[in-house]
Each structure stands twice: as structure tokens, then as C-alpha cells.
Amino acid sequence: MDTNDAASRLEALGNPTRLSLFRALVKAGHGGLSVGECQQRLAIAQSTLSFHLKALIHAGLVTQERQSRTLICRANFDLMNALVGFLVDECCVEERCRTQASDAA
């Protein structure tokens, strides 16, 4: 993942409704939630849910699968883990380098 990819995904999560929706899908696990369940949990209008789902799907953070007459939404856990990894991958690297340099001196 590069900086532009991470930025676009973080931008999608930067909206409180989308973040709440994504967190609900993460909590639901790999089984996901139906669109109706998402709407009930967030207590938002169908049109509002569709708008925010579209943004999360476009960012690759959510997938949808039709099961008979039900649309199931799932968090993309691989992408979520990659995004978290991108954020923490170099955590405190410069601090460690400074510490190692001062220890060597």
C-alpha cells in the first residue's frame, strides 16, 4: 500500500457515519450484515446508507454479495489489516535510530 492508497481509504473513513458503518461490519465479522441490518444498527435512511456504502465500496473497504434477495455487506479485513499495517509499520523508527546512534556513541 502506498501513501495515496492509504490517504483515499482514510478519507473514506473520515466521515463519522462511514466509520460507524465500517466498525459495525468489522464487529459482525466475516459473515457481514445485510443492508437492512446495517440500516437498523445505524438508524439511518436507506438513501443515506446507500450513499455511504458506495464510498466504502469504492475505497475497497467493503464488499457486497447478493444472497438470494438479500445484499450482504462485509468489511474487507485484508485491506483493513494492510491499512493498519501501513500506519504502524514504521512507528517510532526514527526514534529507535536516534536511540541506537546515541547508545553507540
Model regions: which residues?
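Short coil turns linking two alpha-helices in DNA-binding domains
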Residues: 45, 50-52
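A generic local structural motif
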Residues: 8, 58-59
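Alpha-helical residues within the helix-turn-helix
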Residues: 40, 57-58
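Amphipathic alpha-helical dimerization/coiled-coil segments
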Residues: 1-5, 23-27, 77-105
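N-terminal helix-turn-helix DNA-binding core of bacterial DNA-binding proteins
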Residues: 4-45, 66-79
